[in-house]
């Protein structure tokens, strides 16, 4: 099935996350999966990475959580030995209960069984604050988070700006 007319609602370049809006169709509903609490993830826990690695559709890789606190560029990742290759990064990392515990993000080139996923706590923060990450193709700062979400123009009313001395 091919889905067209997908819109980018929000994006975060630093986390490599995007929120997409799918068109509504009366004859089709989209399934959803729960996001697990990050605090419940344990080392040794079985996990499953789903995606299309190397263009092979509908592929599942199994592994275990190696650590829940692997740091890169100021972010903590879930490290797993489930295979994460080009094509399945960006897919869900599930626990045995079918709950998403992370979004597969990267693997180490030349290193087998070294995969990493963004924990759901970052995903939940991104979703809660999606207005701060709102996508605007005409804005070069799209996807950058501001300390306070920038006001958006609505109904033709410009945002109020404060003067500084």
Task: Please report, for each region that a protein language model flagged, where it lies by residue.
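Short, compositionally biased
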Residues: 60-71, 116-118
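Short aromatic/basic micro-patch
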Residues: 19, 59, 92, 117
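A residue-level detector for short acidic-glycine micro-motifs
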Residues: 8-10, 67, 105
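Catalytic nucleophile loop of clan PA
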Residues: 83-104
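Conserved hydrophobic positions within beta-strands
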Residues: 6-8, 65, 93, 100
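Active-site-proximal beta-strand/loop segments in catalytic clefts of secreted hydrolases
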Residues: 22-23, 50-52, 82-83, 103-107
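Conserved active-site neighborhood of the chymotrypsin/trypsin-like protease fold
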Residues: 1-51, 55-58, 73-77, 132-137
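C-terminal cap/linker of serine protease catalytic domains
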Residues: 28, 53, 100-165
């Amino acid at each position: 099935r091919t889905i067209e007319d997908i819109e980018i609602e929000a994006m975060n370049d630093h986390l490599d996350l995007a929120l997409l809006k799918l068109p509504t169709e009366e004859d089709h509903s989209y399934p959803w999966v729960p996001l697990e609490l990050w605090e419940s993830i344990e080392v040794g826990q079985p996990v499953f990475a789903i995606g299309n690695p190397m263009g092979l559709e509908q592929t599942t890789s199994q592994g275990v959580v190696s650590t829940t606190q692997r740091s890169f560029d100021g972010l903590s990742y879930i490290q797993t030995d489930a295979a994460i290759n080009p094509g399945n990064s960006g897919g869900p990392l599930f626990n045995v209960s079918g709950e998403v515990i992370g979004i597969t993000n990267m693997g180490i080139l030349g290193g087998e069984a070294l995969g990493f996923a963004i924990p759901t706590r970052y995903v939940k923060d991104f979703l809660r604050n999606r207005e701060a990450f709102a996508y605007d193709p005409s804005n070069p700062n799209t996807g950058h988070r501001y300390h306070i979400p920038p006001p958006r123009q609505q109904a033709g009313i410009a945002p109020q700006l404060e003067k500084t001395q």
